[in-house]
Amino acid sequence: MKWFIMTLALIVAAAEDPMLSVIPHATVVGGNVRITCRVPRNPKNRAVVFGFEDWTTTSRQLYGEESPITHQILFEGVPCDPGELFCTVLRADGKDRKVVVPFKVVGC
Protein backbone atom coordinates (compact mmCIF):
# COMPACT_ATOMS: atom_id res chain seq x y z
CA MET A 1 0.00 0.00 0.00
CA LYS A 2 2.87 2.36 0.82
CA TRP A 3 4.35 1.93 -2.67
CA PHE A 4 0.98 2.54 -4.28
CA ILE A 5 0.55 5.85 -2.45
CA MET A 6 4.09 6.97 -3.30
CA THR A 7 3.62 6.06 -6.97
CA LEU A 8 0.28 7.87 -7.10
CA ALA A 9 1.86 10.97 -5.54
CA LEU A 10 4.61 10.96 -8.19
CA ILE A 11 2.10 10.65 -11.01
CA VAL A 12 0.00 13.55 -9.69
CA ALA A 13 3.10 15.74 -9.21
CA ALA A 14 4.37 14.92 -12.71
CA ALA A 15 0.99 15.82 -14.22
CA GLU A 16 1.32 19.37 -12.88
CA ASP A 17 4.88 19.92 -14.16
CA PRO A 18 5.41 21.90 -17.37
CA MET A 19 6.93 20.18 -20.41
CA LEU A 20 9.54 21.79 -22.66
CA SER A 21 10.31 20.85 -26.26
CA VAL A 22 13.22 22.30 -28.23
CA ILE A 23 13.80 22.37 -32.00
CA PRO A 24 16.71 21.89 -32.76
CA HIS A 25 18.50 20.45 -29.70
CA ALA A 26 21.76 22.17 -30.74
CA THR A 27 22.64 25.00 -33.11
CA VAL A 28 25.58 26.96 -34.46
CA VAL A 29 26.40 30.44 -33.18
CA GLY A 30 23.76 32.83 -34.51
CA GLY A 31 21.27 30.04 -35.21
CA ASN A 32 17.59 29.95 -34.34
CA VAL A 33 15.82 27.87 -31.70
CA ARG A 34 12.09 27.31 -31.26
CA ILE A 35 10.92 26.31 -27.81
CA THR A 36 7.47 25.23 -26.75
CA CYS A 37 6.43 25.19 -23.11
CA ARG A 38 3.35 23.11 -22.34
CA VAL A 39 1.59 24.12 -19.12
CA PRO A 40 -1.15 21.90 -17.66
CA ARG A 41 -4.23 23.90 -16.71
CA ASN A 42 -4.49 24.66 -13.01
CA PRO A 43 -6.53 27.37 -11.24
CA LYS A 44 -3.41 28.36 -9.24
CA ASN A 45 -1.23 29.10 -12.32
CA ARG A 46 -0.42 32.80 -12.65
CA ALA A 47 2.51 33.15 -15.12
CA VAL A 48 4.90 31.17 -17.28
CA VAL A 49 8.52 32.28 -17.75
CA PHE A 50 10.68 30.52 -20.32
CA GLY A 51 13.89 30.97 -22.29
CA PHE A 52 17.65 30.67 -21.78
CA GLU A 53 19.06 30.82 -18.23
CA ASP A 54 21.98 33.14 -19.10
CA TRP A 55 20.75 35.01 -22.18
CA THR A 56 17.09 35.98 -22.54
CA THR A 57 13.65 35.06 -21.26
CA THR A 58 10.03 35.84 -21.96
CA SER A 59 6.98 35.67 -19.74
CA ARG A 60 3.26 35.36 -20.25
CA GLN A 61 0.44 35.86 -17.81
CA LEU A 62 -1.78 32.84 -17.13
CA TYR A 63 -5.41 32.93 -16.12
CA GLY A 64 -5.71 29.65 -14.24
CA GLU A 65 -7.83 27.05 -15.99
CA GLU A 66 -8.73 29.48 -18.80
CA SER A 67 -5.10 29.75 -20.01
CA PRO A 68 -3.74 28.31 -23.25
CA ILE A 69 -1.82 25.08 -22.74
CA THR A 70 1.06 25.72 -25.18
CA HIS A 71 3.34 28.74 -25.33
CA GLN A 72 5.86 28.99 -28.16
CA ILE A 73 8.65 31.38 -29.11
CA LEU A 74 11.44 31.53 -31.67
CA PHE A 75 14.78 32.82 -30.40
CA GLU A 76 16.94 34.16 -33.25
CA GLY A 77 20.69 34.76 -33.24
CA VAL A 78 21.58 32.49 -30.32
CA PRO A 79 25.01 33.52 -28.90
CA CYS A 80 27.77 31.34 -27.43
CA ASP A 81 26.94 29.81 -24.05
CA PRO A 82 23.34 31.05 -23.57
CA GLY A 83 22.80 28.58 -20.72
CA GLU A 84 20.17 25.90 -20.30
CA LEU A 85 16.62 26.25 -21.57
CA PHE A 86 13.93 26.40 -18.92
CA CYS A 87 10.20 26.74 -18.41
CA THR A 88 8.87 27.89 -15.03
CA VAL A 89 5.22 28.10 -14.01
CA LEU A 90 4.61 30.63 -11.23
CA ARG A 91 1.70 29.69 -9.00
CA ALA A 92 -0.48 31.59 -6.53
CA ASP A 93 0.32 29.10 -3.76
CA GLY A 94 4.10 29.62 -4.13
CA LYS A 95 4.68 26.05 -5.36
CA ASP A 96 6.36 27.03 -8.63
CA ARG A 97 7.14 24.30 -11.16
CA LYS A 98 10.29 24.32 -13.31
CA VAL A 99 11.74 22.11 -16.02
CA VAL A 100 15.27 22.54 -17.43
CA VAL A 101 16.72 21.17 -20.69
CA PRO A 102 20.42 21.31 -21.63
CA PHE A 103 21.26 23.08 -24.88
CA LYS A 104 24.45 23.18 -26.93
CA VAL A 105 25.82 25.90 -29.22
CA VAL A 106 28.63 24.76 -31.53
CA GLY A 107 31.27 26.97 -33.11
CA CYS A 108 32.10 29.04 -30.05
Predicted features and spans:
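Short, compositionally biased P/S/T/A/G/V-rich stretches that sit at domain boundaries
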Residues: 13-33
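Short acidic/polar inter-strand loop motif in beta-rich domains
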Residues: 91-100
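Surface-exposed, short loops/turns at beta-strand junctions within beta-sandwich domains
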Residues: 75-82
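Short edge beta-strand/loop segments characteristic of extracellular beta-sandwich folds
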Residues: 32-40
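Solvent-exposed loop/turn segments flanking beta-strands in beta-repeat/beta-sandwich domains
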Residues: 40-52
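Solvent-exposed serine/threonine-rich low-complexity stretches and specific carbohydrate-binding patches
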Residues: 55-68, 102
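Sec-dependent N-terminal signal peptides
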Residues: 3-12
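Short beta-strand edge segments in extracellular beta-sheet folds
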Residues: 102-108
